[in-house]
């Protein structure tokens, strides 16, 4: 089953929750990165958060190039989860704790995401572990949310280790179990690597990157 209907509904509920509770759109620190998601004026040198809303992409993003580069078919949900929208990360509450779903802020962010997916999969191969790809983070500790590439199930994964706890049999069921979390925007730290300057993806997986690529 495609994860897109569940993602569509969560995005709708997400923005409605902010409008109902706060009377405004969610806010986000773009850190100088433009995006079609931005509502209102945008100044690249501003350090203030902006209002945003998701925008469906004119051309759906694809990971076919990643599949070819690694000679590895990816579970189809990756194209839908990351390729349909431009969006800021999505905060959530769940029975597993609070966390966030990663999304893509702009075209450059998508390219950086692809690079990081490749790096993650190469590290899994190096460690002789089954392939996975990430969809987000839990706020507690260094817990990534990853997809088992063989069957599409959702798991908790600690960087450098195999998946440890299955949360859902599918990405659809996992998203359907989440509730939007209303919270003020948080300004993420800039990382000291040029490839990580894009806030939509890399500033939100700081711990994962440091664990994966600090142990090469």
From Swiss-Prot:
Keywords: Cell inner membrane, Cell membrane, Membrane. It is found in: Cell inner membrane. GO terms for cellular component: cytoplasmic side of plasma membrane. Transmembrane segments: none annotated. Pfam families: Syd. It comes from the Bacteria. It is a peripheral membrane protein. The keyword Membrane applies. Interacts with the SecY protein in vivo. May bind preferentially to an uncomplexed state of SecY, thus functioning either as a chelating agent for excess SecY in the cell or as a regulatory factor that negatively controls the translocase function. Belongs to the Syd family. NCBIfam families: PRK04968.1. This is Protein Syd. It comes from Shewanella putrefaciens (strain CN-32 / ATCC BAA-453). The gene is syd.
């Amino acid at each position: 089953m495609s994860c897109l209907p569940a993602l569509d509904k969560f995005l709708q509920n997400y923005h409605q929750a902010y409008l109902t509770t706060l009377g405004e759109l969610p806010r986000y620190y773009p850190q100088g990165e433009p995006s079609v998601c931005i509502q209102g004026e945008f100044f690249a040198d501003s350090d203030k958060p902006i209002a945003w809303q998701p925008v469906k992409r004119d051309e759906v993003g694809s990971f076919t190039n990643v599949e070819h580069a690694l000679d590895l078919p990816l579970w189809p949900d990756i194209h839908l989860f990351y390729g349909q929208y431009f969006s800021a990360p999505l905060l959530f509450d769940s029975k597993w704790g609070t966390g966030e779903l990663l999304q893509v802020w702009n075209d450059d962010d998508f390219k950086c995401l692809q690079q990081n997916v490749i790096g993650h999969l190469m590290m899994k191969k190096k460690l002789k572990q089954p392939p996975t790809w990430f969809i987000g983070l839990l706020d507690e500790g260094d817990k990534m949310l990853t997809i088992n590439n063989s069957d599409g199930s959702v798991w908790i994964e600690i960087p450098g280790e195999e998946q440890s706890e299955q949360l859902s049999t599918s990405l659809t069921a996992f998203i359907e179990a989440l509730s939007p979390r209303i919270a003020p925007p948080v300004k993420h730290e800039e990382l000291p690597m040029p490839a990580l300057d894009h806030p939509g993806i890399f500033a939100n997986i700081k711990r994962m990157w440091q664990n994966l690529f600090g142990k090469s």
